[in-house]
Design a protein with these regions (language model features):
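Second-shell residues forming the walls of enzyme active-site clefts
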Residues: 8, 20, 26-28, 47-70, ...
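Alpha-helical scaffold segments that flank or form the walls of functional sites
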Residues: 105-126, 208, 217, 280-286
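Short, conserved phosphate-binding/catalytic loop or strand-edge motifs used
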Residues: 134-144
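Short acidic/polar active-site loop segments enriched in Thr and Asp
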Residues: 40, 127, 221-222, 290, ...
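Catalytic domains of carbohydrate-active enzymes, especially glycoside hydrolases
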Residues: 32-45, 115-128
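A charged helix-plus-loop insertion that forms the helical arch/lid used to bind
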Residues: 92-105, 149-151
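Preference for extracellular/luminal or secreted protein segments
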Residues: 1-37, 275-525
Length: 525
């Protein structure tokens, strides 16, 4: 691998950028980015992946091109958090998400899911997982974190997140804590706006920073920034990613973090809309971010590289700091390449372990006095199709629906797919249809945000029919339901979850999960 002393200015700058592309094969525009601008790192999404063998071949091709053009192996990164944020297709083993794992009540499960994920990624050629989420989801109205967090207390997030870190590292994959210094207490998605968390340093130390400190102590080699304003820490109107006070002053100097600092995508609206991606990339580099992500648009990545080159040549970007950052990247890549991975077992063992944890995560937030209602002879399964509730999720629809999958399992009753935000006319029609059924099984997907789903739930509950309500993402949908409604947290809208849920619905299994939240008004009974 090329040393710092052997690198040109452009090669050094290229080590500090990660870029992405559309499609299953890298287009010429993306390959030019590597050849002309020496971009040395890659991010992959679901849009780039067909199956495991294709991903392995793609990673090998990309690694070869980057090594030939830059003399340094790339970090190939991916957001494989589990649950609602997974990039691997169903053909591979996908783990439950953070809050689901915490609902099992066993931190060892977080370690095993990290180890399993690392094994899956390494087998495909990916060496850097952009996980775990260390945000504390203390705001039920948070539109982007929710079930991606391990819970709403710093202690639980620290404990489970640190175990995930240890599992990923033992499995031979780099990982990053995100989103520093915290994205949990906001009602704005930084993909779409510019959130603000108005907390002092002491307040952050008491809550938001505790999981990050624990993750660093567990050995996390990287920390990802967040595009959020923290006005009591950074008085200038710039988000954490672009703030030297936060990146260098807080993370490096006060917390003593010596690993690599990476940015969230600089094409998110919190940066692109308010500051511009190109200017934001340079500001992040100057703030102390080692690896900056331009994940969607190769042309923007090229423009950002040109701008950074000009800044380095005119003295705006400090060359000594550039060298320190690049050396840190080179050492991180050498460390990653030298990892000696452990494994959890063969693919069948990994799949069985993920299914075991997923089944253990299903949580009864409330059960009627008589327990789970019986489905009867003619159950009604209903709910919306999944949709892209945040840009952090995959762009493609799953192609299956909760009602249809449950109807397939039951082999009886009716499946009814509703709108994601049903209006009064649709609600009235659904309630009318429900009257002929023995039991209502409604799956919601962020109904606490799209209120039509909750209006539908309450209208169906008012019929007095036996009813099971399943939250298929954030469990806040389950608040304030009548006592005769069984309320289950399923945590994700995936086929493996539906398979695990079916024995609970048909009465052959009990929901054993424990609610990892204090912010729900109904306690698990």
């Amino acid at each position: 691998m090329r040393t710092l002393q052997e690198m040109t200015l452009q090669e050094k700058l290229g080590q500090r950028l990660a870029a992405g592309f559309q499609g299953l094969e890298p287009p010429e525009e993306f390959l030019r980015l590597i050849k002309e601008y020496k971009v040395g790192n890659i991010i992959l999404f679901r849009r780039n992946i067909q199956d495991g063998p294709q991903l392995k071949k793609l990673c090998a091709t990309l690694r070869k091109v980057v090594e030939e053009e830059t003399g340094v192996t790339p970090f190939i990164t991916i957001d494989q958090e589990g649950g609602v944020v997974t990039r691997l297709p169903e053909s591979e083993v996908n783990i439950p998400g953070a809050m689901a794992v915490a609902a099992t009540g066993n931190p060892r499960n977080a370690y095993d899911m990290g180890l399993l994920t690392a094994q899956e990624l390494r087998s495909c050629g990916v060496d850097f997982n952009l996980a775990p989420v260390m945000d504390i989801n203390c705001n039920p109205d948070n539109p982007v974190i929710g079930v991606r967090s391990y819970g709403d207390t710093p202690e639980r997030v620290a404990e489970y997140g640190s175990q995930m870190v240890r599992g990923l590292l033992d499995g031979g994959v780099y990982c990053s804590l995100k989103h520093f210094p915290g994205h949990g207490d906001t009602a704005v998605d930084s993909h779409l706006g510019l959130p603000c968390i108005d907390r002092s340093f002491d307040e952050l130390m008491q809550r938001e920073l505790k999981p990050f400190i624990a993750g660093i102590e567990a050995g996390a080699p990287a920390v990802m920034t967040t595009h959020i304003l923290f006005p009591q820490i950074e008085p200038e109107h710039i988000p954490a990613t672009m703030s030297r006070r936060i990146m260098t002053g807080l993370l490096r100097e006060k917390l003593g973090f010596g690993g690599i600092i990476i940015s969230d995508c600089m094409e998110m609206d919190a940066i692109k809309k308010f500051y511009g991606t190109v200017n934001g990339v340079l500001a992040a580099m100057k703030a102390g971010v080692d690896l900056v992500f331009v994940s969607q648009t190769p042309a923007l990545a090229a423009e950002a590289m040109q701008n950074a080159r000009r800044a380095a040549e005119n003295g705006e970007l400090d060359l000594a700091e550039l060298d320190v950052s690049v050396q840190r990247m080179l050492e991180a890549k050498a460390q990653c390449a030298a990892m000696q991975p452990k494994t959890l077992g063969d693919e069948a063992a990994c799949r069985a372990r993920a299914e075991e944890v997923r089944a253990a995560s299903i949580t009864a937030v409330h059960l009627p006095r008589g327990g789970m209602p019986a489905l009867g002879d003619n159950p009604l399964f209903l709910g919306c199709a999944d949709y892209r509730s945040t840009i952090a999720s995959n762009g493609e629809s799953s192609g299956f629906t909760f009602p249809e999958e449950m109807r397939r399992h039951a082999d009886k009753g009716t499946a009814l797919v509703t709108d994601k935000d049903p209006g009064d006319a649709e609600i009235a029609e659904v309630v009318s249809q429900a009257a002929a059924h023995s039991c209502i099984v409604l799956g919601t997907y962020n109904g606490h945000i799209l209120q039509g789903q909750l209006r539908l739930a309450k209208a169906l509950a008012a019929t007095g029919l036996p009813m099971i309500l399943v939250a298929l993402r954030n469990p806040y949908d389950l608040r304030n339901m009548p006592n005769h409604v069984a309320a289950l947290a399923g945590w994700e809208y995936t086929r493996p979850l539906f398979d695990a849920l079916w024995p609970v619905l048909n009465g052959t299994a009990r929901p054993t999960g424990k609610l990892p939240l204090l912010t729900l008004t109904k306690a698990a009974k």
